[in-house]
Regions:
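Charge-dense, helix-prone N-terminal extensions
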Residues: 1-126
Length: 126
């Protein structure tokens, strides 16, 4: 999946547009809820070397928040790694060019739900 197709999926599915909150950095995009402003995704460019590859190729990566019980369900074969530059107890990194689209979409859906306003989450589960 490309960065643009990922962002398009989020715009279409969640009606959220990317935010570029970092000065002078117009490549790193944050996707957040409209009501509580919590991040559910961070898209950035990172060297493959940061994930243990012997390559300096810079690729698009998305960080997503997962419930702790889901950690270990996905692995590097799925393009899923411990989070780069975020709390590894709560976040994962997905290498967009390496991960299957269905896994990316599933995990962004999980992240979106995990970062919803708690009152809204309760209503949807009742």
């Amino acid at each position: 999946m490309t960065k643009q197709s990922f962002l398009s999926y989020c715009v279409t599915t969640y009606n959220t547009s990317p935010d570029y909150p970092f000065d002078e950095d117009f490549e790193t995009a944050v996707l957040r809820h409209g009501d509580n402003r919590k991040w559910y995704a961070l898209v950035m460019r990172v060297s493959r070397r940061k994930f243990g590859f012997d390559s300096d190729e810079v690729i698009d990566v998305v960080n997503l928040k997962l419930p702790t019980e889901m950690f270990g369900s996905f692995g590097v074969a799925d393009g899923v790694y411990p989070a780069y530059h975020m709390n590894k107890l709560h976040w994962i990194s997905i290498l967009l060019p390496d991960a299957p689209d269905d896994i990316i979409q599933f995990l962004v859906n999980v992240s979106f739900e995990a970062t919803k306003d708690k009152r809204k989450r309760r209503k949807t589960t009742e």
